[in-house]
Amino acid sequence: ILAYKDEDGNPLVDKILDTAGQKGTGKWTVLASLDYGAPLTLIGEAVYGRTLSSQKDERVEASKILSGPKPKFNGDKKQFIDDLMKALYASKLVSYAQGYVLMKYAAQELGWKLNNGGIALMWRGGCIIRSVFLGKIKEAFDKNPDLTNLLLDPFFKEKIESSQAA
């Protein structure tokens, strides 16, 4: 999206309204993480970010009073974008890993027997969450149904390690 230009040749990202609404699923997920004692840091921050972004009028008023740093970048733009992509990928991996930990804790408390690989395929089939590597999640749980954290699977371990510096 950073490179995409609209029909008039200008960056599309500059035209996207900086507000977001919520349907409640993120909030419910964060509340469940608190109930079950499962850290869900990235999803929690995403919910807070959406909440803050929805307060557009307050942010505009505050920007008239509070001074902040002027956006300025002097580094290697290509390296920055590569790092941004790696950081986004790492956050996605961590979000999935934390989500599976939440489901594991809920299953333990509620006596559920979950098919974690099947859940990944179900998401790929039409849920709000879709990703190419959902198949890799299924493979990880097929290899080790007792996997305690997705990041401990060799594929995901390698991916998170190669993205950490970003």
Describe the function of each predicted region:
Residues 1-166:
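C-terminal substrate-binding/catalytic lobe of Rossmann-fold NAD(P)-dependent dehydrogenases
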